[in-house]
């Protein structure tokens, strides 16, 4: 990417579609120019269930983004949930004919192409190769090897594989909208540069994006993308629990969640009374204590973190995580979510501050 390039990304979530327009700055980082969104229910538990609804939502967000950024959008990068992604680690050793000629850009490009030479599981296809580091013959790790003197170098890269069927569905959707797909990017990888600060980018972190209906897991060991998955639980499950247990409308449940959102009962300062306005159970008391509401929220949040912990433990990717970064509209408005995460995961957790967001 060159300085000044305009990059467009589109994320299809459980409750909405987002389009983000960014520009590459002088440091090679993408600064957000604008972000637009539109409600959409065409995705359920990570599966596309309504191509037409998704197409209309994408078209709406693109139109809004074009007006806001004053830029015509013809193509975009598209995110893919972690459940459809397989990451294969591969290393390629490139021998050079002349040690004193210096490593050329072509040498690096050839090594990247060699990294694609892997056994591809049935039903998967390669969508990207992400170089994580290059090691010279003296053991030195460099990010930009071009011009370095070395008799050989080792390229370490992640080969990103995605389900062919999901790509077919995405292609069909974007064909309807008239937008070319520049590339397909795992959601966690796309969020990494926006959600992690400079220090976190070099640390071993797990990025958790708890959305409305799904939680995206992304694990990074420095520059190396090691694991991703999707857990089919999110903020909407908390709202549904409140609605069912208290027998109130989902609209009121969502309002109460936002107003009294707290992840742990132990942090209650004042156990206020709450009047239920839409309670459908005549035998039920229409007034509850806030602790009753927070107990419902706490139980579901504990379950979400417990399932995440089981997933990363079962897949042997937990031991190297130093920090968990928490983000996502499904949980960021619930106070002490980071504390609940630390208790259940037994790893330091903090909320994402995000970066390079210009508003």
Residue spans for each PLM region:
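Extended, folded domain segments that form the structural surfaces/walls around functional sites
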Residues: 11, 197, 209, 303, ...
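A conserved active-site cap/scaffold subdomain adjacent to cofactor or substrate pockets
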Residues: 232-253
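Nucleotide/phosphate-binding catalytic cleft detector across ATP-hydrolyzing
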Residues: 1-16, 20-206, 224-226, 249-251, ...
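A short acidic Gly-Thr/Ser loop motif
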Residues: 10-16, 80-82, 207-214, 220-223, ...
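Amphipathic, non-transmembrane alpha-helical scaffold segments
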Residues: 294-301, 305
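Glycine-rich phosphate-binding loops at beta-strand->alpha-helix junctions
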Residues: 262-264, 319-343
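Glycine-rich phosphate-binding/hydrolytic loop that grips phosphoryl groups
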Residues: 350-359
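A short, acidic, amphipathic alpha-helical segment used as a generic capping/interface helix at domain edges
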Residues: 304-314
